[in-house]
Amino acid sequence: MADQSSLFLSRPCDVSKYGLIWAGVQKNVGPAGMSIVIIREDLIREDLPEFVPTYLRYKTHADADSLYNTPNCWSIYCCGKVFQYLLANGGLEAMAQRNEEKATVLYDFLDRSQFFTAAVRKEDRSLMNVPFFSPSKEQDAEVAASAKAAGFDNLKGHKSVGGLRASIYNAMPKEGVEALVDFLKKYEAEHT
């Protein structure tokens, strides 16, 4: 089982390795308000405890060809546009390469920085969300505020971790990551 919300469609995935993949579409696929479920047939069961509501039973949706309720047509339309874009631009292999390049730009800077510190060990790093820290919580807040003033929104870290976080999902172009690194370099030069 895997929640792949952050990495769904960011790279190829062998779905045969999973019994169930769930993904909220709001990261890489479309607007918030829809989820995608890929489930192995043997896990679509009828023998669930009575307290599980009808809507939360995967069999309900499988039997109704995913049309148990009125679908979110706008999200489906937008997702379709994303699928067309991915197919027209090299598929998931090409997207994986672009995402690797973007993440490398940011991680290379963080690994060389004397001011900022990458929050995650190299072998565990995400290509979609890059958490990092400045020397202090107060400095993190100042970096986030300065970044916002410079046009870089939502750099504040996740509420459970703190620090800073750059979300560089599929829609973020490499040029956007390079611009962020330029901003961080300038900020570091002005504060060391």
Regions found by a protein language model. Give the residues of each.
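Catalytic PLP-binding core of fold-type I/II PLP enzymes
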Residues: M1-S16
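Conserved active-site segment immediately N-terminal to the catalytic lysine
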Residues: V15-Q26
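PLP-dependent enzyme catalytic core of the Aspartate aminotransferase-like
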Residues: A149, H158-T192
